[in-house]
């Protein structure tokens, strides 16, 4: 099964872009360039939202697609489009990524902000997180992570300090914990006690 990886760059105070989508604060170097080149060799599919797609188009990534990769853009406002390397769709992102994960191929890169990643985390589809944390506090901007419906536990795989002062961290997403029989029994007992209390109150 293919691995789904959520990755990118963020400020120390949890923003991945300014409010106007600007990323002028990102620190680029030959070291980062090599790391990113090796990183993208592990993927053949990129998933992004409308805002990330539009930034990619403005930066010259050939219509938002990346060489040798299939790019999926999820948007409710862009006109649907399907070519060999680019798919713009309004389908449910979790359903599509769930299907892609079962197919043969390299890993899948989730690129962009937390609004796109949120339903994927909640559906337990993301396997790994990798971020280049920058030594800057933006103060405001577009947040990387948003409130989710359950806790996500992580295991540190790698941590590397770059010459720019950035810290590159990689985490494995742990599978959701299964509720034990004891916990289920306790929950049932609590419901039973609550029901008896309500009955007596009547």
Predicted regions span which residues?
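Enzymes that bind and transform nitrogen-containing heteroaromatic metabolites
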Residues: 1-202
């Amino acid at each position: 099964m293919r691995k789904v990886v959520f990755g990118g760059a963020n400020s120390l105070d949890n923003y991945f872009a300014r409010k106007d989508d600007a990323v002028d604060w990102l620190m680029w170097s030959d070291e980062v360039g090599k790391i990113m080149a090796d990183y993208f060799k592990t993927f053949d599919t990129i998933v992004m939202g409308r805002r990330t797609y539009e930034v990619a188009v403005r930066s010259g990534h050939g219509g938002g697609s990346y060489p040798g990769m299939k790019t999926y853009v999820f948007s409710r406002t862009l006109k649907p489009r399907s070519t060999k390397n680019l798919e713009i769709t309004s389908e449910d992102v979790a359903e599509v990524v769930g299907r892609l994960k079962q197919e043969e191929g390299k890993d899948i890169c989730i690129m962009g902000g937390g609004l796109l990643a949120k339903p994927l985390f909640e559906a337990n589809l993301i396997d790994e997180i990798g971020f280049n944390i920058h030594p800057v506090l933006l103060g405001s901007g577009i947040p990387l992570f948003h409130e989710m419906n359950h806790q996500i536990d992580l295991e540190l795989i790698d941590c590397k300090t770059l010459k720019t002062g950035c810290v590159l961290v990689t985490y494995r997403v742990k599978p959701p914990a299964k509720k034990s029989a004891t916990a289920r029994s306790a929950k049932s007992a609590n419901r039973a006690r609550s029901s008896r209390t309500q009955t007596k109150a009547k």
